[in-house]
Swiss-Prot record:
UniProt subunit comment: Component of the 1.8 MDa SAGA (Spt-Ada-Gcn5 acetyltransferase) complex, which is composed of 19 subunits TRA1, SPT7, TAF5, NGG1/ADA3, SGF73, SPT20/ADA5, SPT8, TAF12, TAF6, HFI1/ADA1, UBP8, GCN5, ADA2, SPT3, SGF29, TAF10, TAF9, SGF11 and SUS1.
SUPFAM superfamilies to which the protein is assigned, alphabetical: Histone-fold
Domain Histone-fold: 30-97
Protein name: SAGA complex/transcription factor TFIID complex subunit TAF9
Keyword terms, alphabetized: Nucleus, Transcription, Transcription regulation
Main localization category: nucleus
GO biological process, one term: transcription by RNA polymerase II
Intrachain S-S bonds: none
A cellular component annotation (GO) from this entry: SLIK (SAGA-like) complex
Membership in a protein family: Belongs to the TAF9 family.
């Protein structure tokens, strides 16, 4: 660590830890990757595999591309009466983001609610297991052994 800068350590796929920081060549590392390294370091994440920034960049690219495609569809639909040269607006992008969050990112239920539902479900006891030997069959009304089933047509014999 020369020059008083802060180094960021990241773990590559072999398990060794490599160093990315002010000492590494800034020209070789793309700007977006450097920003992601700084973002991870600001969140106190100093050890991660080398492909993590690439995966984050891939996710951001795909998400942005999907939002912009949706915004173009909304703009085309809303701009049917407008001139054909109207560009993409901020409202179209906001609508696309809002529509995408409705189905793409499902929020999980709060832990307290899940514990309450589990306690309510667990109030009802499970049926007792009989201490008999052999194969345990379901109740007689659900078994095919309850009646004599003729699967063959007697006329064909």
């Amino acid at each position: 660590m020369n020059g008083g800068g802060k180094n960021v350590l990241n773990k590559n796929s072999v398990g060794s830890v490599s160093e990315v920081g002010p000492d590494s060549t800034q020209e070789e590392t793309p700007r977006d990757v450097r920003l992601l390294h700084l973002l991870l370091a600001s969140q106190s994440i100093h050890q991660y595999e080398d492909q993590v920034p690439l995966q984050l960049m891939d996710f951001a690219h795909r998400y942005t591309q999907g939002v912009l495609k949706d915004a173009l569809v909304y703009n085309d639909y809303a701009g049917s009466g407008n001139s054909a040269g109207s560009g993409l607006g901020v409202e179209d992008i906001r609508l696309a983001i809002a529509a995408r969050t409705q189905y793409q990112f499902k929020p999980t239920a709060p832990k307290e609610l899940m514990l309450q539902l589990a306690a309510e479900r667990n109030k009802k006891a499970l049926p007792q297991v009989m201490g008999t030997w052999g194969v345990r069959l379901p109740p007689e009304k659900y078994c095919l052994t309850a009646k004599e089933w003729d699967l063959e047509d007697p006329k064909s014999m």
